[in-house]
Design a protein with these regions (language model features):
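Surface-exposed loop/turn motifs in large extracellular/passenger domains
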Residues: 3, 41-43
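Left-handed beta-helix
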Residues: 7, 12-13, 18-19, 24-25, ...
Length: 112
């Protein structure tokens, strides 16, 4: 399946977006970010930004869902998890398969 990218979203020229990825309006996928959804879907909500060198990956049975107005800090890894609206994932944080983070949360930088 090919990615679906809203016309108002920004995807950096060297970002990688593969498979069943949906990117909402006004979202930003920045330099060096990798979004891979070959085996389960990834959804990036409206107004969310995925900063430089992040990795978002989905596994069978573990889609990755990132809500609206979220910030995913530089070099964070989101793997088959759900991130609620208006949540900040700090730089270098790692969130793994099956994790569910609520809305209006902060995940500290380098947290696992």
């Amino acid at each position: 399946m090919k990615p679906v990218i809203h016309e108002s979203a920004f995807v950096a020229e060297n970002a990688t977006v593969r498979g069943s990825v949906t990117i909402g309006p006004e979202a930003g996928i920045y330099f060096g970010a990798v979004l891979r959804a070959e085996t389960a879907p990834i959804t990036v909500g409206e107004g969310t930004n995925i900063q430089d060198n992040c990795v978002v990956h989905a596994d069978p049975g573990f889609p990755a869902v990132i809500g609206r107005d979220c910030t995913v800090g530089h070099a964070a890894i989101l793997h088959g998890c759900t991130i609620g609206d208006n949540t900040l994932v700090g730089m270098g944080a790692i969130v793994l398969n099956g994790a569910v983070v609520g809305r209006d949360c902060i995940i500290a930088a380098r947290a696992l």
